[in-house]
Amino acid sequence: MNTAVTLLTEQAPQPIEEFGQLERQIIIILDFGSQYSELIARRIRETQVYSEVLSYRTPAEHLRQLNPKGIILSGGPSSVYSDRAPHCDPEIWNLGVPILGVCYGMQLMVNQLGGEVAKADRGEYGKASLHIDDPTDLLTNVEDGTTMWMSHGDSVTKMPPGFEVLAHTDNTPCAAVADHEKKLYGVQFHPEVVHSVGGLALIRNFVYHICECEPTWTTAAFVEEAIREVRAKVGDKRVLLALSGGVDSSTLAFLMHKAIGDQLTCVFIDQGFMRKYEPERLVKLFQEQFHIPVEYVNARDRFLDIMSGVTDPEEKRRRIGHEFIQVFEETSKNLGPFDYLAQGTLYPDVIESADTNVDPQTGERVAVKIKSHHNVGGLPKDLRFKLVEPLRKLFKDEVRKVGRSVGLPEEIVQRQPFPGPGLAIRILGEVTADRLNILRDADLIVRQEINQRGLYNEYWQAFAVLLPIRSVGVMGDQRTYAYPIVLRIVKSEDGMTADWARVPYDVLEAISNRIVNEVKGVNRVVFDITSKPPGTIEWE
């Protein structure tokens, strides 16, 4: 997902109350446009406490109804003294719950409560040593001199009444502040980022000691709740699910099948752009090993036909998406009728997208999109389902935990990200049957060599790319003129940024030797050493 620094919160999602009022303990993050708002929520959940990201515009009364144990104000790109700076409802200071302001959030707190903020003589960016003046409360067990990550051009110049300084850095006199009596806290740094060495300890102090939360957000509790809620929502109706083989749709299928059994129909549309042996393996795995019926639709020829002469990557995606809709529509009508579409929406999708549609008669959310990893755009307007989205509260790492808990095999749980258009966007230029076969064989070798050495889980993605050019080579005494294969192997935490992997030379050598000797039509292998940014992980 892409998280922009610019303010994106005006269309931030409403609280997730799809199955009624939340009963669990919750910490709310009010988003002021920070690139780290989602990360704050993830850090809170790592403490086994539930959290949600809401718009800074959320009224205090709405927050009161949610009954949060605490509120965190995110950072943001604005200056609080700017005319267009985003401000929260000032009534939140009277809610009587602990509040932690982070970077911009701290400056907003200071500004609204009677302090002053101004442009700093020197901005502070990157790592800084935190000197602790008050080691109690928020900073308990945070080591004096610990490294914290700074990113600010403004600073607090006057404290509000009742506040005191908890910590400072060489350039920032008010790096952490508090009104202990009202349980209002602010930090100028970002405790949520990995560079902040003492950040997790600070977050745990806020969650457990100040907000007095209990670690009740567990995988087992979620699965039990999700199954109960799916049954309550669906009743005896039929549900359709588009299976892709990825961890999201596979976890969704397992969870839905546990909840409603034969009321679920899984459809796998084979568009011909998956990796070698994957379609057969997927269907066999679900039907024979897990006893979850899958309707297999072989649409390879249809998708290959629409790729004829197409070289532009966006046009490839558009055509694949359009054809997927057509096949999906035909299949759903043949197998239907269905009342619900099970969709693998995750919480980052909820945070980032306002693409929802509400039926004016029932108030139900209805499908206007297939899950984004299918890259298929909107469904036809006459193909309307009510949505059931049991994973929409979860981040990706939480989905993997749920997958394991419901019995999903590790090969799917740990499956590396794979684009919806598949190999069609890993073949630069026109997609043909011959090029697909070449790339499938090369890609299989990459995965085999990495798997054999136990390196698969070391990399975010490891795959082959086929270039639409030919290079000169020599095999035996013969000159060759064949395709080059690009190896793309990267490390990443979340796909937002990535670094090229320092793959051992012997592994690269083995991959290269096997590809040029075993894959007909290839005589050269090159290794992509571009990070993201400036490059992207995929070539198209």
Swiss-Prot record:
Residues at which ATP binds: 244-250
EC numbers: 6.3.5.2
Reactions mediated catalytically: XMP + L-glutamine + ATP + H2O = GMP + L-glutamate + AMP + diphosphate + 2 H(+)
InterPro entries listed in its UniProt record: Class_I_gatase-like (IPR029062), GATASE (IPR017926), GMP_synth_C (IPR001674), GMP_synth_GATase (IPR004739), GMP_synthase (IPR022955), GMPS_ATP_PPase_dom (IPR025777), NAD/GMP_synthase (IPR022310), Rossmann-like_a/b/a_fold (IPR014729)
Domain Glutamine amidotransferase type-1: 26-216
Residue stretches making up the GMPS ATP-PPase domain: 217-415
Keyword Ligase set for record: yes
GO CC annotation terms, alphabetical: cytosol
Top-rank lineage group of the source organism: Bacteria
Pathway terms, separated by semicolons: Purine metabolism; GMP biosynthesis; GMP from XMP (L-Gln route): step 1/1
Keyword annotations of the record: ATP-binding, Glutamine amidotransferase, GMP biosynthesis, Ligase, Nucleotide-binding, Purine biosynthesis
Molecular function per GO: ATP binding; GMP synthase activity
Record-annotated active site: 103, 190, 192
Function field: Catalyzes the synthesis of GMP from XMP.
Subunit comment: Homodimer.
Protein name, as recorded: GMP synthase [glutamine-hydrolyzing]
Species this chain originates from: Nostoc sp. (strain PCC 7120 / SAG 25.82 / UTEX 2576)
Gene: guaA
